[in-house]
UniProtKB/Swiss-Prot annotation:
Gene coding for it: rsmC
Keywords tagged on the record: Cytoplasm, Methyltransferase, rRNA processing, S-adenosyl-L-methionine, Transferase
Subunit structure: Monomer.
Organism: Pseudomonas putida (strain ATCC 700007 / DSM 6899 / JCM 31910 / BCRC 17059 / LMG 24140 / F1)
Primary location class: cytoplasm
Enzyme class: transferase
Name this protein carries in UniProt: Ribosomal RNA small subunit methyltransferase C
The keyword Cytoplasm appears for this protein: yes
SUPFAM superfamilies recorded: S-adenosyl-L-methionine-dependent methyltransferases (SSF53335)
A GO CC term assigned to this protein in UniProt: cytoplasm
Cited function: Specifically methylates the guanine in position 1207 of 16S rRNA in the 30S particle.
Any one GO MF annotation of this record: nucleic acid binding
Family designation: Belongs to the methyltransferase superfamily. RsmC family.
Subcellular location: Cytoplasm
EC number: 2.1.1.172
Amino acid sequence: MDPRSEVLLRQAELFQGPLLIAGAPADDLLGQLPQAQAWTWHAGDQAMLESRFAGRSHYGVEAPEAAFESAVLFLPKSRELAAYLLNTLASRLAGRELYLVGEKRGGIEGAAKQLAAFGKPRKLDSARHCQLWQVTIDQAPQAKPLESLAERFELALEDGPLQVVSLPGVFSHGRLDRGTALLLKHLDGLPGGHMLDFGCGAGVLGATLKRRYPQSRVTLLDVDAFAVAASRLTLAANGLEGEVISGDGIDAAPTELSLILSNPPFHTGVHTNYQASENLLKKSAVHLRKGGEMRLVANSFLRYQPLIEGALGNCQVRDEADGFRIYQATRG
């Protein structure tokens, strides 16, 4: 069980009524708290929770409409996302309890200071390198529309400026990361057809593909609901059409793809997690058509080339700069 869940269950008597668990991990916490419901924005966690606790988990960027008497937020990595979620929960809990649980290395002590905007926070427990905080909502805020927190910026690309809309919690929020910047220089000569932007984030790569290859069908895929929402906003801001879907890794992707383009993720919260990226590389041949291509950027220290060669039988390094490599491989 997640150590944060274990800390929560040390105070289980506080959580016996209708409770919303925001950012709920995919463990047995719902099984221990029979009146609780989960809210998650991670498609993989949603699939696991729904399979074990059918009808008790909500997926998306908005809180579920069902009533709850108290709520607990599992602290996310992003400070901006934490602020949005705390505000959203507090807006529905006037005079009631809001809890915050998180790891010390994830910044729980600093994040707990945000609770002071709603009342007088107090620390209830500290164990398993985690802390549990509580506040009674004396001053319920107005709920903020998610789009009001969007960061909008413009990228100067070869074929003209691209408008990007990023949301709290999305990778490289409000800026272009160095890996994607390098990959944007290597989008020439791609095979047309059905293109996939895997781990799309704010949709920079997918939007660029659709503009450069307008006759191709472009699908953008991410595990995170906030990334899916941001990608849709980015496409709309540029007058582009594309399919944006949520799913847990490459298994959720279409088949017969002409291209897989990616700056694959390797973090889950504050933890390093290479599973999604390694699955992408190992299973790429299942999703590419014959002659289809995979082109991706990754940190130079990651040993991805042998995995790509094992899956597709070939791999070349197109470029290397600023600690990143561009890999290219074709399904024979």
